Amino acid sequence: HPIQNLFQPSLVLDM
């Protein structure tokens, strides 16, 4: 994934 799990796990999965 482009970004690490800095905010929400869902965000990372979406990206």
Curated annotation (Swiss-Prot):
It comes from the Eukaryota. GO terms for cellular component: extracellular region; interphotoreceptor matrix. GO terms for molecular function: retinal binding. It is found in: Secreted, Extracellular space, Extracellular matrix, Interphotoreceptor matrix. Keywords: Extracellular matrix, Secreted, Transport, Vitamin A. Its main location: secreted. Signal peptide: none annotated. IRBP shuttles 11-cis and all trans retinoids between the retinol isomerase in the pigment epithelium and the visual pigments in the photoreceptor cells of the retina. This is Retinol-binding protein 3. It comes from Cricetidae sp. The gene is RBP3.
